[in-house]
Amino acid sequence: MITKIYKLIFSFSVICGFASCSDFFDQESEHVIFTEKDHLHNATDTIYSVIGILNKLQAIGDRTVLLGEVRGDLVDITNTANSDLRDMALFNMGDDNQYNQPRDYYAVINNCNYFIANVDTAMKNNRNEYLFMREYVAVKAIRAWTYLQLVLNYGSVPFVTDPILSKIDAEKEFPRYNLQDICQYFINDLAPLTDRWANEYPNYGNIRTLRNGASRLLFFPVNIVLGDLNLWLASVTGNQSTYREAAMRYYKYISQRNGDNSTYPIGASYYSWMPGSATWDNMYGYISGGDYSSETYGQNTELITVIAGDSIPAEGNYSQLRNLFYSREDNDYHVSIVPSTGMFNLSESQANCCVSSTGTTFYYAPSDLTRHRAGDLRLYWCYDWGQGTNTLTGERYDVSYIDKQSFQNIHIYRRSMIYLRLAEALNGAGFPRAAFSILSTGLNNEILSQEIYPRCSQSDSLWISQIDFPETRYGIITVQEYANQTSTANHNTIGIHTRGSGWTPFNEYYKLPDVEPLFEVDEEGNPIEGSYIYQKDTPELTQRQKEFVDSLLLNENGLELAFEGTRFYDIMRFAYRQPNPGQFLADKVYARRGKANSGAMRGEIKKDLTDQRNWFLQWNGQIGLQ
C-alpha cells in the first residue's frame, strides 16, 4: 500500500545559520510516494519508488536548462517570452516566479532520503547477488546531483539527509550548506561506492520513448557526478589535487563506460566546408557515433543522461523547452528564446581552417559570410531562422529553430561535455598541453608520449600516465581522412574545436603559447632536421598556458554546448578561478548583446553582477545568500 505523506513548500526561518523546517510540509500533498513499511523489501516497491523519484525530477528539468542558459550570454529573450522568463534573464526573479520554487528540489531530495534510509541493501538473490544496490547507488547519485543544482542556483541551502515525515521532523533545525560544503559532503558520500558500483545501473527496459535499453539514460553516472563535484570544489578552492581527482573521475567514466578497459572515444563527427571547395555554399556534416539528437543507448552514442518528459501537456510534466526554443504549431510559431548577439559574435570570431581535397594544403573561410556561416559551423547546423506566412491572413511572422531543444526529453549529460570537463580539470591540474590536445588534435597515448611526458616532471608524468588512451582504440583521424570524410575503424578521435572550426591542427590562429623550439646542431651550427629537443615546461610557461587554455575552454563550451543549459554555470565556474570573479562574470553576461551594448545591458539588468550575492536566487527572504 502506498502512503501519501507531505509536500515540501519550504518556508525557512534562519537562526544562527540553521533553518527550521516547521512549515516545510502540506499534509494534503502526494510528494512522498513510498510504502508505509519500514523497509523496501521487494522489487515492486523498490522499482516503484525509484520511478517515483525520476518522476519528481521532471519538475526541475526545464528550469535546470533555463536557469543555466537564460542568465548567460548566448541567448536572448523575445517579446513573446512570459514575464517569469524575462525576469530570469534580468536577474529579477521574485518569490512567485514559476522557476523559483525550491520546494521541487526538496521533493526529489526527501524522496531520495527516504529511499536511502529504508531500502534493504543487504538483500541477495539465490545467486548471492545484491538485489537493490544498483538502485541505492543510483538514488544517491540523483540526490547529490539535485543538491548541486540547488546550491548552484541559491548559493546557501538548508541541508537535510534524513527523511522528513512528520511535523516533529519538520520542526528540527538544519544547517545551511554552501557550494563548498555540498561538494565536500557528496564527494565523501559517493566515492566509497565507485569501486564496485560505478558502472552498474538499474535496468527497467523500455520506458516510453526510451527504447533498446535506453532506460539507462535516466540515471546519473556516479563518476560524472563526482567529477562535477570535484571540479566545482577545485574551482572555488584552487586546490590542484582536487582538479586531479575531477580529471580522474571523468577519465574513469570514459574508460569504464562500456566495461573495464573499454572504449568511449569523442568520435569523429564534425561540420565542415567541403574540402577543396571555395564557393562557400557546400557544407558537409560527418556524423560518426551519433549526435545529441539520438535518444538511444549504445556503446558509441553521444547522449548519457536525460530527464524524461511527458508526451502530452495534460500529464503534468510536459517539457516546455521545445515551445520556448523552437517554432512549432503548439506555440503559434512564436519562440521565447533565440541566440544572442554574443552567440553570433563568438561563433563568427573563430577562424575556420579549410583543407584541400587532398589534405595537403589549407586556407581559411571568409569572415564575412552571411546566415551565420562565418567562423564556427556548429551554430549554423543547430539553428535556423526565417519567416513564415499565416495561410488565413497572409500575415508574415518570424520563425526560429534551435534544434537542440526540440525533444520530448531534457538532455543533461552527453559525451562531448564530459571530454570538455576532462580538459578543464586537466588544465587546472597543471596539464595545459593535455587539455589543449583535447581541443586541437584529440588525446591518446601517442600524444601523451610525444607532447606531454617529455615536458613534465617525473612526478607529474607518473600521475598523468594513469590516463590511458591506447592508439589501437583511440586512433586520431588523419587530415587525409578528414578531407575524404571517412575514418578507419579505430580512428575515432578528433580535436573538439575541429567539430566546427575546420582542421584545427593546421590552424595558425589556434596555437598554444610555447618557447622557441630547440634543435641539435651539426658541426657548423646548423639545426639537424628531426632532432627536436624537448624542454621542460617552466612554472611561468605552464601558468601562461593554463590561462590561455582556460579562455579557449570557456569559448569551446559555448561553441559546443550552446543552448543546452550549462552556459551560466560554466561562466560562474570559470569566474571562481579569476582574480576578480564578480567582474569576470558581469563582463560576460553584460555582453549578451555585444560588448558595445554592455552598458545598456547592465542598465536593463539593474542587478550589480560584480556582487556575487546577485548571482543567486532568493526565495521568501529565507533561502539564498543574504
Language-model-derived ranges and their functions:
Residues 1-31:
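Bacterial Sec-dependent N-terminal signal peptides
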Residues 36, 64-77, 199-220, 224, ...:
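Short, surface-exposed recognition loops and adjoining beta-strand edges that mediate ligand/DNA contacts
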Residues 21-70, 593-626:
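Membrane-proximal, proline-rich intrinsically disordered regions
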Residues 151-158, 232-239, 430:
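Short coil/turn linking the two alpha-helices of tandem helical-hairpin repeats
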Residues 20-21, 210-214, 297, 302-321, ...:
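Long, intrinsically disordered, low-complexity segments
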Residues 47-48, 82-154, 173-184, 188-202, ...:
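Conserved, well-structured interaction surfaces
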